[in-house]
Regions:
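Helix-turn-helix repeat elements of alpha-solenoid scaffolds
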Residues: 15-28, 58-74, 101-115, 138-152, ...
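Solenoid-like repeat scaffolds
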Residues: 30-39, 70-79, 116-125, 151-164, ...
């Protein structure tokens, strides 16, 4: 039997490519540490597993593992103190991730927000990140509260728990567009573009918000401007199914053949995702595209490469749209709103 060596286990999974293979290796390390009753290393491994799921997976594993992490770190007051910083960051990741899973009841989401707020205040941190993440949740359920939280986010002091200038400007773009303040949104967006600010998701998300707003307003000139960089930024990215879906919406209106090619190129990402929020937005765009293509008599291919006739495309579009309706009903039931249904 292989001797338990936590440092070697961590070294081994850090050497792997980020994604599913690394996540499997971290789960193996978690099991080994728990079997050895090694609480400090089990806590570290749980942290790494949650981080990997949030930033290189579909966030599904993070939501499963987070309660286990909390139970473990709270067994020992010394461990709880030692891991406070990591725990605060995980709360921040989890309250945002929970927005994307209708399976997490609203009561549980609100409880996590309450716990996160308490920990921030008890340890002298700003509520800026809390307001930002709660505004995201309320953007799908309570627009008035979203607006208030957005204002509080802008007014709260910055501190070390912030996501950095690029991400915070990106949030300003998002929420300013949500409340119809396009001037403020463009001021923030231009800072990102002019200064070439970058994160793993910025400016991809920024272009996505701008494209979505342009399509809602019927401004196809602006939409064409934003879709060009967005297409290359989101293509093949498992995190960006929402943005890919928005590109498909654009292609459904402008270039069906290009849209079919883009859809076929990225549909494997959709099939491999366990994130219902991302799947909803991808499916919404796919259904619009395939419906329009079928109406124009175009054919396509499925994920196996089999050619689909216009009639088969139409049937596939209806199947996808029915899945969208189901997801919309489930999110709206959890959120107690009609946001997702209204987006169909």
């Amino acid at each position: 039997m292989k001797q338990y060596n936590p440092e070697q286990l961590r070294q081994e999974y850090r050497a792997l490519q980020s994604g599913d293979s690394r996540m499997r290796a971290i789960r193996t390390a978690v099991a080994a540490a728990e079997q050895a009753n090694d609480l400090p290393w089990a806590v570290r491994f749980h942290h790494d597993l949650i981080h990997e799921s949030v930033f290189s997976g579909d966030r599904y594993q993070a939501l499963i593992d987070f309660p286990q992490y909390l139970a473990m770190v709270r067994r020992d007051p010394e461990q709880e103190r030692e891991n406070l910083w990591d725990t605060l960051w995980m709360y921040k990741w989890i309250v945002e991730a929970a927005t994307e899973f209708y399976q997490i009841e609203k009561k549980q989401v609100m409880q996590w927000f309450s716990e996160y707020r308490r920990m921030l205040l008890e340890n002298g941190y700003s509520l800026r990140s809390w307001y930002e993440k709660r505004a995201i949740f309320f953007s799908y359920s309570d627009r008035a509260k979203m607006r208030l939280d957005f204002e509080s986010f802008q007014n709260a002091a910055k501190d070390a728990l912030g996501d950095g200038e690029a991400s915070e400007l990106d949030s300003v773009v998002r929420f300013a567009l949500e409340i119809g303040d396009r001037k403020k949104a463009m001021q923030a967006a231009n800072q990102i573009f002019d200064r070439n600010l970058r994160t793993e998701e910025v400016p991809c998300k920024t272009y996505h918000y701008l494209l979505r707003d342009a399509l809602k307003c019927g401004d196809m000139d602006a939409a064409e401007k934003y879709v060009q960089p967005l297409r290359s930024l989101c293509d093949g990215q498992r995190f960006q199914l929402e943005a890919i879906g928005m590109v498909l919406c654009y292609d459904a209106l402008t270039d069906l053949r290009r849209g079919l090619e883009f859809y076929q190129k990225n549909q494997a990402l959709r099939e491999g995702s366990r994130n219902p929020f991302l799947c909803f937005w991808f499916d919404r765009g796919a259904a619009k595209l395939l419906t329009a293509a079928a109406e124009q008599g175009l054919s396509g291919t499925d994920i196996s490469g089999m050619v689909l006739t216009p009639e088969q495309l139409s049937e596939k579009a209806e199947t996808i749209m029915q899945n969208c309706r189901t997801l919309a009903e489930r999110f709206d039931a959890r959120n107690r709103s009609n946001y997702f249904s209204s987006e169909l």
